[in-house]
């Protein structure tokens, strides 16, 4: 499954009835879409041209033409087993597991590149660069991503915080000020504790950034800047693997962008941390 079809699957439950009719028709007839005009798609799905246009915008396409081209590209090899995200299967041998998990992780990064807005990454990088304090909030697998962000930004001497204690998270958030930044990491965008922390940060006046799945959700709807990842949930939800990889990739992008902006200021800190950890190596 490729980017455009995954986008539809991710947001289909949030669509209104007319938009959902179109989405369902596309998922069930993906190979035929490239041959349909906007009027024909509206008619076959029992919807309207205006609903098709709205759906294209929701999916972050400039118009139906761009969307139709994306669908055509995505369906070239859609029937091949190698082009589908896979989950735990007790019948898989080790070779298949290595191949499938590597594919899942790689594809989640490729798909995220399609929905990650350069303009919003720029805004997020600028906000973090200028901020006095930066908080990262996450629970479970998303806390691992928050800690990765903490470790990276600490290396360039940013005043960063991350904690697994949800009480401390919301206390940190409530004491932020205008000019500070809070980053909420939650794949679903519906994690209650993370939502409460980012809500407190926003109410305190901080700039709020989300790293969530593509589309509308409670956390992205609340935040000032949304950095979407695109990695479909698998039935077993085996440890949030590919979605975590996509989130980590977004953090790497943010860190590299911020460090590049501040390079003359932070290169000394990067060198200092490199030297300080050298003594921890065996060789």
From Swiss-Prot:
Annotated InterPro entries: Homeodomain-like_sf (IPR009057), HTH_RpiR (IPR000281), RpiR-like (IPR047640), RpiR-like_SIS (IPR035472), SIS_dom (IPR001347), SIS_dom_sf (IPR046348), WH-like_DNA-bd_sf (IPR036388)
CDD domains in the cross-refs: SIS_RpiR
Pfam families reported in the protein's UniProt record: HTH_6 (PF01418), SIS (PF01380)
Residue ranges: DNA binding: 38-57
Residue ranges of domain SIS in the record: 124-264
Residue ranges annotated for the HTH rpiR-type domain, each copy included: 2-78
Coiled-coil features, chain-numbered ranges: none
One annotated GO biological process: carbohydrate derivative metabolic process
Protein keywords: DNA-binding, Transcription, Transcription regulation
GO molecular function: carbohydrate derivative binding; DNA binding; DNA-binding transcription factor activity
Protein name: Uncharacterized HTH-type transcriptional regulator CA_C0191
Organism: Clostridium acetobutylicum (strain ATCC 824 / DSM 792 / JCM 1419 / IAM 19013 / LMG 5710 / NBRC 13948 / NRRL B-527 / VKM B-1787 / 2291 / W)
Upper taxonomic lineage: Bacteria, Bacillati, Bacillota, Clostridia, Eubacteriales
């Amino acid at each position: 499954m490729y980017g455009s079809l995954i986008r539809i699957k991710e947001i289909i439950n949030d669509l209104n009835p007319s938009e959902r009719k179109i989405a369902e028709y596309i998922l069930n007839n993906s190979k035929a879409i490239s041959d349909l005009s906007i009027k024909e798609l509206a008619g076959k799905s029992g919807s309207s041209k205006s609903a098709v246009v709205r759906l294209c915008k929701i999916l972050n396409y400039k118009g139906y033409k761009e969307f139709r081209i994306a669908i055509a590209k995505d369906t070239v090899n859609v029937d091949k087993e190698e082009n589908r995200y896979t989950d735990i299967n007790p019948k898989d041998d080790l070779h298949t597991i290595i191949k499938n998990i590597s594919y899942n992780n790689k594809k989640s990064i490729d798909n995220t590149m399609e929905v990650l807005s350069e303009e919003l990454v720029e805004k997020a990088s600028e906000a973090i660069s200028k901020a006095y304090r930066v908080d990262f909030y996450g629970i479970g697998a998303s806390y691992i991503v928050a800690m990765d962000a903490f470790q990276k930004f600490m290396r360039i001497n940013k005043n960063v915080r991350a904690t697994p204690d949800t009480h401390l998270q919301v206390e940190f958030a409530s004491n932020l000020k205008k000019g500070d930044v809070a980053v909420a990491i939650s794949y679903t965008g519906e994690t209650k504790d993370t939502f409460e922390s980012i809500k407190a940060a926003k109410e305190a006046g901080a700039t709020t950034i989300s790293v969530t799945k593509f589309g509308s959700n409670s956390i992205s709807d609340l935040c000032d800047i949304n950095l979407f990842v695109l990695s479909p949930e698998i039935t077993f939800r085996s440890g949030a693997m590919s979605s975590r990889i996509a989130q980590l990739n977004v953090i790497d992008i943010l860190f590299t962008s911020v460090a590049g902006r501040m390079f003359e200021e932070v290169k000394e800190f990067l060198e200092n941390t490199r030297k300080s950890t050298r003594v921890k190596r065996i060789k």
